[in-house]
């Protein structure tokens, strides 16, 4: 199979070479001077300084010494008639001899007839040639691509400002021979085969054509089995229909196999090459090639009897054709090496000729181009005061709006306006401001095609005809009497025209017109050009310079292209991309980036190559505290049972991951580690059998290769995990299943060799014996570790740099990275070409500069930051250049943008190495760090390159200095080599950014008591020394925070007591007001009541209490409710315990607190924090190791679910950070094979289980209520031995509440 693409490539190169060889002149040294032998009469010009023809050959010194026009302006030109079509390869110019007259820049135009000129272009833009700097030196230009023409025209653009236009010219080339056939739209050529059937496995068809119309068949052939090949013009584009043996695909109903080209009805030559090998086809029109695979059942194209050129004749009906025939000329027509036109000229018996001639007859049609949307117009005279009016012309444009015609009618008839508005043709006759008549017709007339318009008015009837179809008459025009005027303004109005001779309510027309008739008389536009007829401004006469800016389509990633006369637009709405050319992905490149943005676990789309071609892939981002896992699900993650498979009839299952293999490879290659769990459950079903034997089961990986090793084993070793551990059931085998036992067992493990992942298929061959059965499960592809986002290097000498291969980005370039520095300036990166270059640098402490040159001169964009950028913090830079704009973005500052010029060079051509962190001159080097450098979505592996480069170190420390604020709610940022993590030890929250609330539902009897003691970690894997748990048992301040939802009042929320009878209490009074009670230093109890609302109202409330020394503040729901100063030297003595909910000990509570405590707290509480301690989090997460006691039922839940619901009902919300759960059972899951009996049995079991649970809970509740005090004592005795003895004894608080309390109401 691999040999076919190779053969295709070889044949394609061979055929392309032969085609170009056939079309190139036979003289390989095609550089002969062609103008030096011409007579003076072969030269003509727009005007001449002396009024007579002046020979303008190179080095001419006689007479005036060359050509100069009468006036030096942009309308002048010099042309020569070379006598016949020749191949032109170079040009040269001089100034006029002995003068100060020379041209400094010019353009070239070519023509076969001296009419309908074509401008010379390079890079799809009108090319400007550099001219002379004096009168005598010769400036020679080799054409990038040769031109075949008879007439050449030099158009001066700029000249010596101290002189005038002056030229002596030469063109170089050689003779050009070709075979041409002219088709008049009713004729064809038939090439009859020598045998009945022509069957070919490969074809090469080449030709050149010029067409007079937008539709017509160039050639056609078909066979009886449905084979056909047809090339036809459709609305100015070439459509190729090709089918190989598919009888269902008929030409009349099938869509084209490929469509190429645009504006091919411009009466200029266009080249076509069709190369086919089997079903692989290359279709080339001019310089654009489309490769496709054709439909069909075979590789051979079977054509019966003949090929027809110019039309599709109907068998048995001479002169009748199935489709519109071709009208124009075809040149050098070759079919598989056969020169068809040469055979026809020599009247060979294989050719049957219709009304075909062998020279190209072309009508002398003169088009004009309206260039400027504000100043272009054409004024033509008419015959005034005729009863009626007759005007017709053809136009083509890309603009939806524009004035086509304005004329003031005689005899007070009003003004006639014809315009395009929204692509619709609109005819209006108005008197003053009153609209007398209006006709609308057509749609989408800005499609770039030629459209014919005719206006006829006689007496009181107006007829508007568009493309030979008459529009419905105006309903209110029956009484209009029209008399023709004497001036007709086409395209626009003069700027200095102030009267009603020309009205233009919209912008001027930009486009082409031709075949203008007024009063049924054609208008000679060459006379207009010569100044003898009418007037004009900003017109190109004798050429139509329309250009299809959507060919090729520069809208990327499937964006749709539309255009106006001057630019193109991209519609990105149906893509996953954005930007002027749909270049930028709307998705991030990895789960790591989503995590960095503050997202939590969920489904996301990632675009691994950013602006590259791969496209987005849906994944699950499991964003945990330590690793960020990327999971890619496939279509079969359930346990699947297999029976009846054997080597002759194997079982195979392909896995679909919802994306291409390239997308999956990008995810894997961009990760530090990837794995897939594979499980094989077996009963008398062998897996691998022996390391040297043929395996019974294998899997297919990314390269479509078989892999006989199983999970837990390294590649190349035909074993399972138990074989490496020497723990298999049978020591003679290396997998449990290879023991071939008549009972269920399994081999389960992880595949983690990235070059083989993902698993794309599994094949099983040993489940066809008696009692033989297997069940398999392959988990999702899971990866962690972003090798792109944290890939960083440090530059510590100005002369150091990293170099990479040349950055190839001709049409679109985007560069993004992070940097941090303390230097004043330095170059981030630079890439040079011969003239082009691209450079990004920090040019001052507060400025980033992006400079680029694509050949039109440097463009520089600067973003200035209001704050310093050399602050040793990470900053983000993104620079982009495309065919629409150049832009620079720094952090979140306003983007700097510059529109790209529509003309001139547009390819960015670089050829040096890419320098990162410096320049090729080793000057202006960057000092600092660069991270996550991407060019057009591709990661640059900075760290790997830095390992072998002096002056550069891999990695860059100090992420927390920039990203520490991402850790919320008291979380601490911890540095890692490849990033950072948030340590939530001291926070009542959890999650990757300490933003996830830890909350629980309390019942009325629930109590959570935290005993203060030596520092104890409440987060796993955090050492005691690194734990910042509060250690001072005699604090001088309190920072208390909690959130709650309840409907119960009174309620006790929080109780803090000390061994010296000090306490702080937070409770809800009976009326729902919140009360905070402070008793410190044996003072009277301070009671602070906030009764602004009933806080037992099923809504979430947030309380913050802060005391530092004497100053106390209380916030409720983010509003400051109270501020108070205690007496001097107030402090909280040694704290004993903190209780949430009901206080179960006998602590001698005062009456108010006792009332609230009797009710306890029923509701939901979350985010509880006392200084650096999170007691609720400790109870829920680390109850076995933290000094915390729980009485009653405490159920973890989200308080958000309790709002506006029954808070007294205990609701448990189970969540999983990874929806793709794993199963590792010794036997297959019972639901692998579903049955009704299993479902019914399961329901019964669940009901019985629930009943027993209810009985158990009731029994436990009654027991706990009776033994609560005893349990509290026992719990304290279970603390670790290293606790202070003062906390091992039970301490009863004495009732020191004064009879005289201070109470504060807010």
From Swiss-Prot:
It is found in: Membrane. Residues 1-24 form the signal peptide. Residues 30-174 form the F5/8 type C domain. Residues 1259-1306 are cytoplasmic. Pfam families: F5_F8_type_C (PF00754), Laminin_G_2 (PF02210). Glycans are attached at residues 282, 355, 496, 571, 622. This is Contactin-associated protein-like 5. It comes from Homo sapiens (Human). The gene is CNTNAP5.
């Amino acid at each position: 199979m691999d040999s076919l693409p190779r053969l295709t490539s070889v044949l394609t190169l061979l055929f392309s070479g032969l085609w170009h060889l056939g079309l190139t002149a036979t003289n390989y040294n095609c550089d002969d001077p062609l103008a030096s032998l011409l007579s003076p009469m072969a030269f003509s010009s727009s005007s001449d300084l002396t009024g007579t023809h002046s020979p303008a050959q190179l080095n001419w010194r006689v007479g005036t010494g060359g050509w100069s026009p009468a006036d030096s302006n942009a309308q002048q030109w010099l042309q020569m008639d070379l006598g016949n079509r020749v191949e032109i390869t170079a040009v040269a110019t001089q100034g006029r001899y002995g003068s100060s007259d020379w041209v400094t820049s010019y353009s070239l135009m070519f023509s076969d007839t001296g009419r309908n000129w074509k401008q010379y272009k390079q890079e799809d833009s009108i090319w400007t040639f550099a001219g002379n700097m004096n009168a005598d030196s010769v400036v020679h230009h080799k054409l990038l691509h040769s031109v075949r023409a008879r007439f050449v025209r030099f158009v001066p653009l700029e000249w010596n400002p101290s002189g005038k236009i002056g030229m002596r010219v030469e063109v170089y080339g050689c003779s050009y021979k070709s075979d041409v056939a002219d088709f008049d739209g009713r004729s064809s050529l038939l090439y009859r085969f020598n045998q009945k059937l022509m069957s070919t496995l490969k074809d090469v068809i080449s030709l050149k054509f010029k067409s007079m119309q937008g539709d017509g068949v160039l050639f056609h052939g078909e066979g009886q089995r449905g084979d056909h090949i047809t090339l036809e013009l459709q609305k100015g584009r070439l459509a190729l229909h090709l089918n190989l043996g598919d009888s269902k695909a008929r030409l009349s109903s099938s869509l084209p196999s490929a469509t190429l080209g645009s504006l091919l009805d411009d009466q200029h030559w266009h080249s076509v090459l069709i190369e086919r090998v089997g079903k692989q086809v290359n279709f080339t029109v001019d310089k654009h090639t489309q490769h496709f695979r054709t439909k069909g059942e075979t590789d051979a194209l079977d054509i019966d009897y003949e090929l027809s050129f110019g039309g599709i004749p109907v068998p048995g009906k001479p002169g009748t054709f199935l489709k519109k025939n071709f009208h124009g000329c075809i040149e050098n027509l070759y079919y598989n090496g056969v020169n068809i036109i040469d055979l026809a000229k020599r009247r060979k018996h294989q050719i049957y000729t219709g009304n075909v001639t062998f020279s190209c007859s072309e009508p002398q049609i003169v088009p004009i181009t309206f260039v400027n949307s504000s100043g272009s117009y054409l004024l033509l005279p008419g015959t005034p005061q005729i009863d009626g009016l007759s005007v017709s012309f053809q136009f083509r444009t890309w603009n939806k709006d524009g004035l086509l015609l304005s004329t003031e009618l005689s005899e007070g008839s009003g003004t006639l306006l014809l315009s395009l508005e929204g692509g619709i043709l609109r005819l209006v006759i108005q008197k003053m401001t009153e609209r007398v008549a209006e006709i609308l017709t057509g749609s989408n007339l800005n499609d770039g095609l030629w459209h014919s318009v005719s206006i006829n008015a006689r007496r009181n009837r107006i007829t508007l005809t568009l493309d030979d179809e008459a529009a419905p008459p105006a309903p209110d025009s029956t009484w209009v009497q029209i008399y023709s005027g004497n001036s007709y303004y086409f395209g626009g109005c003069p700027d200095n025209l102030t009267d009603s001779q020309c009205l233009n309510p919209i912008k001027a027309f930009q486009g082409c017109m031709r075949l203008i008739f007024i009063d049924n008389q054609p208008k000679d536009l060459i006379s207009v050009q010569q100044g003898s007829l009418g007037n004009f401004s900003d017109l190109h006469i004798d050429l139509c310079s329309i250009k299809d800016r959507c060919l090729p389509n520069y809208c990327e990633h499937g964006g749709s292209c539309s255009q106006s006369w001057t630019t193109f637009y991209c519609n990105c709405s149906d893509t996953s991309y954005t930007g002027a050319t749909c270049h930028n992905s709307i998705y991030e490149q990895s789960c790591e980036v989503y995590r960095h943005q503050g997202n939590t676990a969920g489904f996301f789309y990632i675009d691994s190559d950013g602006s590259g071609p791969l496209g987005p892939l849906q994944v699950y981002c499991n964003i945990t505290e330590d690793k960020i896992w990327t999971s890619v699900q496939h279509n079969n993650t359930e346990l699947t049972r297999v029976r009846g498979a054997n080597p002759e009839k194997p079982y195979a299952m392909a896995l679909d991951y919802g994306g291409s293999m390239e997308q999956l490879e990008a995810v894997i290659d961009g990760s530090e580690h990837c794995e897939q769990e594979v499980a094989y459950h077996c009963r008398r079903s062998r897996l691998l059998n022996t390391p040297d034997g043929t395996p019974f089961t294998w899997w297919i990986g990314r390269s479509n290769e078989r892999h006989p090793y199983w999970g837990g084993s390294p590649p190349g070793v035909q074993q399972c995990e138990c074989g490496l551990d020497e723990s298999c059931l049978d020591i003679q085998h290396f997998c449990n299943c290879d023991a071939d036992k008549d009972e269920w067992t399994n081999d389960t493990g992880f595949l983690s060799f990235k070059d083989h992942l993902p698993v794309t298929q599994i094949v099983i061959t040993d489940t066809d014996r008696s009692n033989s059965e297997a069940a398999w499960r392959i988990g999702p592809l899971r990866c962690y570790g972003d090798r792109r986002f944290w890939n960083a290097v440090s530059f510590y000498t100005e002369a150091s740099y990293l170099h990479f291969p040349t950055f190839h980005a001709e049409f679109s370039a985007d560069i993004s990275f992070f940097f941090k520095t303390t230097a004043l300036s330095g170059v981030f990166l630079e890439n040079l070409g011969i003239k082009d270059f691209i450079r990004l640098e920090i040019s001052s402490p507060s400025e980033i500069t992006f400079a680029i040159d694509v050949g039109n001169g440097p463009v520089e964009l600067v973003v200035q930051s209001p704050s310093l950028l050399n602050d040793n913090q990470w900053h983000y830079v993104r620079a982009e250049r495309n065919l629409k704009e150049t832009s620079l973005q720094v952090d979140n500052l306003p983007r700097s943008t510059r529109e790209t010029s529509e003309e001139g060079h547009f390819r960015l051509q670089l050829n040096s190495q890419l320098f990162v962190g410096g320049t090729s001159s080793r000057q202006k080097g960057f000092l600092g760090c660069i991270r996550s450098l991407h060019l057009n979505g591709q990661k640059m592996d900075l760290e790997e390159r830095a390992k072998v480069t002096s002056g550069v170190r891999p990695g860059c420390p100090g992420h927390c200095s920039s990203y520490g604020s991402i850790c919320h709610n008291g979380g601490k940022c911890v540095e890692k080599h490849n990033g950072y993590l948030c340590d939530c030890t001291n926070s009542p929250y959890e999650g990757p950014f300490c933003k996830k609330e830890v909350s629980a539902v309390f019942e009325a009897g629930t109590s959570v008591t935290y005993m203060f003691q030596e520092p104890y970690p409440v987060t796993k894997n955090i050492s005691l020394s690194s734990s910042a748990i509060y250690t001072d048992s005699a604090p001088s301040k309190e920072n208390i925070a909690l959130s709650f939802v309840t409907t119960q009042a009174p309620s006790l929320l929080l109780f803090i007591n000390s061994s010296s009878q000090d306490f702080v209490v937070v409770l809800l009074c009976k009326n729902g007001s919140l009360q905070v009670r402070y008793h410190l230093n044996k003072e009277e109890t301070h009671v602070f009541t906030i009764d602004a609302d009933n806080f037992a109202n099923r809504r979430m409330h947030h309380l913050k209490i802060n005391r530092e020394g004497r100053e106390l503040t209380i916030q409720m729901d983010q509003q400051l409710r109270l501020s108070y100063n205690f007496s001097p030297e107030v402090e909280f003595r040694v704290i004993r315990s903190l209780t949430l909910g009901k206080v179960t000990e006998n602590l001698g509570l005062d009456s108010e607190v006792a009332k609230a405590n009797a009710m306890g707290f029923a509701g939901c509480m979350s985010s509880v924090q006392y200084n650096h301690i999170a007691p609720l989090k400790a109870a829920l997460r680390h109850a076995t190791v933290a000094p915390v006691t729980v009485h009653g039922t405490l159920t973890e839940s989200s308080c958000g679910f309790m709002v506006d619901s029954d808070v007294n009902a205990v609701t448990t919300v189970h969540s999983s950070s990874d929806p793709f759960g794993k199963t590792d059972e010794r036997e297959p899951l019972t639901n692998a094979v579903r049955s009704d009996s299993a479902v019914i049995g399961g329901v019964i079991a669940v009901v019985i289980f629930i009943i027993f649970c209810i009985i158990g809970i009731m029994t436990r509740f009654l027991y706990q209520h009776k033994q609560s005090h005893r349990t509290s004592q026992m719990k304290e005795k279970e603390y670790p031995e290293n606790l202070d003895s003062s906390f091992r004894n039970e301490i009863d608080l004495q009732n020191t509440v004064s009879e005289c309390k201070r109470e504060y109401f807010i």
